[in-house]
Amino acid sequence: MSLLTEVETPTRNGWGCRFSDSSDPLVIAASIIGILHLILWILDRLFFKCIYRLLKYGLKRGPSTEGVPESMREEYRQEQQSAVDVDDGHFVNIELE
C-alpha cells in the first residue's frame, strides 16, 4: 500500500493529478494531523510571547489575599501603588553642552 495521496501522470491534455484511494483511513488521519499541526504552528509563531510567558509564570497575578483582613489588603495595595508611582525628584537631569 502506498502512502502517496496523489500521483502526477501524463494525460492527453498535459500533466494532471490522479487521486488514489483517498478514502483510506490512514490517509484521512494523516491529513487531519497535518492540518492540525500547521494550524498549531501558525498560532505558535503568532502568539509565542504570550504562550511561553503563560507557561513560564502561569496565571499568577500576584500573591493570594485569601484569608487576609480587608485593612491589610488595602495597605498592601497602597504599598504597591506607591512603589509604582514615579517621583520626579529622583531623576537627575544631565545637560550636554
Curated annotation (Swiss-Prot):
Topology, Virion surface side: 1-22
Keyword Isomerase: no
UniProt GO cellular component terms: host cell plasma membrane; membrane; virion membrane
Modified residues (Phosphoserine): S64, S82
Disordered: annotated span: 60-83
Keywords noted in UniProt: Disulfide bond, Host cell membrane, Host membrane, Host-virus interaction, Hydrogen ion transport, Inhibition of host autophagy by virus, Ion channel, Ion transport, Lipoprotein, Membrane, Palmitate, Phosphoprotein, Signal-anchor, Transmembrane, Transmembrane helix, Transport, Viral ion channel, Virion
Membrane topology: Single-pass type III membrane protein
Protein origin, superkingdom: Viruses
GO BP terms in the entry: protein complex oligomerization; symbiont genome entry into host cell via pore formation in plasma membrane; symbiont-mediated suppression of host autophagy
Location in the cell: Virion membrane; Host apical cell membrane
Further comment: When the channel is activated, one or more imidazole moieties of His-37 probably become bi-protonated.
HAMAP family, sorted: INFV_M2
Domain notes: Cytoplasmic tail plays an important role in virion assembly and morphogenesis.
Descriptive protein name: Matrix protein 2
Encoding gene, per UniProt annotation: M
